[in-house]
């Protein structure tokens, strides 16, 4: 069983690398890929756990549902604040509050993804490469370069 807090710690550590942050945001904005799913698939690979294509498809659906219901509208709200209300005297405080809430929504998405993975039966495989089931090969290479 995967633990939510261990994955959160792994994801935060990886995302704190500026190059990794840029690559993941590029995947999200230019290729419509989910950052949390990329991080989770890499985490599982690090643990030597290989998912099936069907498992990854289920994770994609789970992430997409939460993106549609919660994260995308929230990101739009944050961008609107930045683009149209940056002159508001308490802009910095409002933006900080929105970012904090968005981070909680990211945690919620990670929690849901971990819960779903815990229902799967990943095989043990020291050569696991879960990202290859989600990203084109060129993006997998970009991810791995940013990680190293």
Where are these predicted regions, by residue range?
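N-terminal intrinsically disordered, cationic/polar leader segments
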Residues: 23-26, 72-76, 108, 127
């Amino acid at each position: 069983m995967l633990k939510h807090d261990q994955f959160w710690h792994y994801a935060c550590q990886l995302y704190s690398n500026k190059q990794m942050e840029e690559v993941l945001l590029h995947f999200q904005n230019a290729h419509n890929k989910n950052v949390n799913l990329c991080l989770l698939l890499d985490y599982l690979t690090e643990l030597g756990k290989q998912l099936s294509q069907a498992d990854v498809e289920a994770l994609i659906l789970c992430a997409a549902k939460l993106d549609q219901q919660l994260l995308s509208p929230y990101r739009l709200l944050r961008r609107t604040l930045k683009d149209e209300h940056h002159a508001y005297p308490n802009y910095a405080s409002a933006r900080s509050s929105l970012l904090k809430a968005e981070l909680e929504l990211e945690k919620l998405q990670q929690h849901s993804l971990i819960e779903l993975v815990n229902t799967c039966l990943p095989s043990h495989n020291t050569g696991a490469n879960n990202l290859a089931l989600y990203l084109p090969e060129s993006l997998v290479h970009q991810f791995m370069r940013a990680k190293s």
